[in-house]
């Protein structure tokens, strides 16, 4: 397997972790009134854990972007880009399996995930080179 494919999978996994952390962090924060609370040190300190979780999620996005840039150095875009959609698969599975999210398994979502995986597989297949006469 090319190194670029490993970077693409790492990017999708990091996006997955980032999404899950953002969901956890934002779910724990009280409703935001941005004009007041971001400058209130008491509010910030009282919510330091969920804010930290959100911040780590944002770092996950940055690391994912680094992996993605490394992917683009070695893989054609039409092969690399579909691999990003694997994050949909990972997020769905983890949101159903991990108890913090309490997402429900459904047939329609599962079939959609199967189609995504099938599409990624089809696009990643080598294409035959045809010559024109």
Swiss-Prot record:
Residues 51-125 form the EamA domain. It is found in: Cell inner membrane. Pathway: Bacterial outer membrane biogenesis; lipopolysaccharide biosynthesis. Residues 27-47, 102-103 are periplasmic. Keywords: Cell inner membrane, Cell membrane, Lipid A biosynthesis, Lipid biosynthesis, Lipid metabolism, Lipopolysaccharide biosynthesis, Membrane, Transmembrane, Transmembrane helix, Transport. InterPro entries: EamA_dom, Flippase_ArnF, Small_drug/metabolite_transptr. Pfam families: EamA. One of its GO terms (biological process) is lipopolysaccharide biosynthetic process. Residues 1-5, 69-80, 125-133 are cytoplasmic. It is a multi-pass membrane protein. SUPFAM superfamilies: Multidrug resistance efflux transporter EmrE. GO terms for cellular component: plasma membrane. Heterodimer of ArnE and ArnF. Belongs to the ArnF family. NCBIfam families: PRK02971.1-2 (NF002816). HAMAP family: Flippase_ArnF (MF_00538). This is Probable 4-amino-4-deoxy-L-arabinose-phosphoundecaprenol flippase subunit ArnF. It comes from Proteus mirabilis (strain HI4320). The gene is arnF.
